Amino acid sequence: MVIGRHRNTRAIISLEAIKHNVATQISKLKDGQSLFAVVKANAYGHGMIPVAKAAKEAGANGFCVAIIDEGIALRESGIKDPILILGVNPASEAVCMAKHDLSVAVGTLEFLTEAQKLLQEEKQRLKIHLALDTGMGRIGFRNTEDLKEAVDFIEKHSDQLKCEGVFTHFSTADSKDPAYFEKQSQKFDELVGVLKKKPKYIHQANSATALWHPNFEGNLVRMGISMYGLNPSGDMIDETWNLEPALSLESELVAVKEVEAGSSIGYGATYTSSQSEWIGTVPIGYADGWLRRMQGFKVLIDGQYCEIVGRVCMDQFMVRLPKKYDLGTKVTLIGENNGKVITAQDVANYADTIHYEIMCNITERVPRIYK
């Protein structure tokens, strides 16, 4: 996708905030524990390479991605630290992953058997993190019998396969009710007990686990949403670490006009002015990730909350202004403006979603500006 460098719409990313959040998490680690920065999905929309380098500078020991190509991109950027692919990958890519020194999550014996043959042919060895499905229902071994069979296979073919880690993912670590979390934790302990030799990494802690369940098992934290300064629970549970949000989303007024009473605005004529009003146009739309359903939400202009009127268009939306503003006046969609703040959570609440999705939806057409 073409990046809109000649349009004054931009995502401002504070790498200092990233570093602060990573350093805060590191300060909470116990002796022998490490931190992997989760930079999948373009670092949750923040920009994978700059964020990864900032996290490394702050002390991150490695990285987590979702797909092979993300891992390769990190390697091509010069990063030599451990990289774990958390997603499912075809065994046909085993040699590719091994050659790029990428560790991979594995949750089936079928992957291991197919990958082993290919790795043997190419004289390569692949690092494995055994995924355990303790209740997420996504990927991983679900019972001790299947897990033991996989462990035995890896040990038998140690020239091609190395068990570097074992892990699970909690589905309710960000919930006020700890019951299901505790059930998953117990299941994890049961499954890990199958391993006669413990691998280098044993991990179950995502951002929410590290925040609200500090006595978690294992020696590795996978720091995801909290690295970007956002509360994993949204606004259900308070976070006390003073995380700093790293992303602001800004644009500007490119058209300002006064319309008379009875004027309709936007596709479908869904808004009609009740009196003479000043209307401003902002050059960002749903093609940039600003959802069409944000009609009626408010943005910040000169410290004033201004309502989005009419439907959000593909490339633009319109706002009702309290007065005439100059062209080029800054519009804040996420972030601070003259002492007022709109958070990613505010946007998510209005859109009936989560702030993860709001961040990831910001398309590549919006340039990321780093400071």
Curated annotation (Swiss-Prot):
Active site: K40, Y267
Chain residues that bind substrate: R138, M314
EC numbers for this chain: 5.1.1.1
Cellular component, GO annotation: cytosol
BP terms from Gene Ontology: D-alanine biosynthetic process; peptidoglycan biosynthetic process
High-level lineage: Bacteria, Bacillati, Bacillota, Bacilli, Lactobacillales
Positions bearing N6-(pyridoxal phosphate)lysine: K40
Biological source species: Ligilactobacillus salivarius (strain UCC118) (Lactobacillus salivarius)
Protein encoded by which gene: alr
Recorded metabolic or biological pathway in which this protein acts: Amino-acid biosynthesis; D-alanine biosynthesis; D-alanine from L-alanine: step 1/1
Family (UniProt): Belongs to the alanine racemase family.
Protein name (database record): Alanine racemase
